[in-house]
Amino acid sequence: MAAAVAGMLRGGLLPQAGRLPTHQFIRYGSKAVTRHRRVMHFERQKLMAVTEYIAPKPVVNPRCLPPPPSPPQEETGLIRLLRREIAAVFRDNRMIAVCQNVAMSAEDKLLMRHQLRKHKILMKVFPNQILKPFLEDSKYQNLLPLFVGHNLLLVSEEPKVKEMVRILKSVPFLPLLGGCIDDTILSRQGFINYSKLPSLALAQGELVGGLTLLTARTHSLLQHHPLQLTALLDQYARQQHEGDPVVPASAQPDPPNPVQDS
């Protein structure tokens, strides 16, 4: 009996193995605030300040050091193709104009390209990374200062400067920087002055007219003195003919006066 009561008490008060307790204590109250960082102890702060790592200063400023050599870039097929195209553009065209490639809409660029193509003027765009090395090794190296930023080329087999300047005036946000005509470097003002020159046919006509006028004047100058001499001789002959007395054919001329002896 006593053993049974002890078993009941033990079963009701002490949990058996493998079973959860019938009563659990749950804590209801404020939790610990962990959002704030705990302040470091003053002694530890001094220790951390003393043992802080101080990196040595470099002897030479890194900005003064030369940049590391860049790895050589492999020449792809596209780069070789662009180089051949650039060489053909500078070899086959007499007029090469350099313009600043500003932000233009696709419609405006297409319209301007169409207007230039009417006069056989082509628009070419090449990357400066390929264009500048070509110019450095060619006779066009004085054009290098023009290639800053984004540029485009206006090329033609014949110097159509007047038509190009007229079209560029209608597009004020596409500035003309300079270029070359027949291997002669011109500035922007040089292109404008070149466009004001007369056409080749008109210049040839003026030259032929000037040469004809000079030839006619030379001919008149060469004929002036002989004609003047002939007129003077003719006038002299008439004066001599009018001054001679009229002598009849049957009459004898008067004898000369005898010379008196002294």
From Swiss-Prot:
GO BP annotations listed: translation
One Gene Ontology CC term in the entry: mitochondrial large ribosomal subunit
GO MF terms held by the record: structural constituent of ribosome
Membrane-crossing residue ranges in chain numbering: none
Bias-annotated ranges (Pro residues): 253-262
Transit peptide, residue positions per record: 1-28
Cross-referenced Pfam families: Ribosomal_L10
UniProt entry keywords in alphabetical sequence: Mitochondrion, Ribonucleoprotein, Ribosomal protein, Transit peptide
Disulfide bond annotation, renumbered to this chain: none
UniProt-annotated stretches for the region Disordered: 240-262
Primary site of residence: mitochondrion
Subcellular location, record wording: Mitochondrion
Family: Belongs to the universal ribosomal protein uL10 family.
Quaternary structure and partners: Component of the mitochondrial ribosome large subunit (39S) which comprises a 16S rRNA and about 50 distinct proteins.
Protein name per its UniProtKB record: Large ribosomal subunit protein uL10m
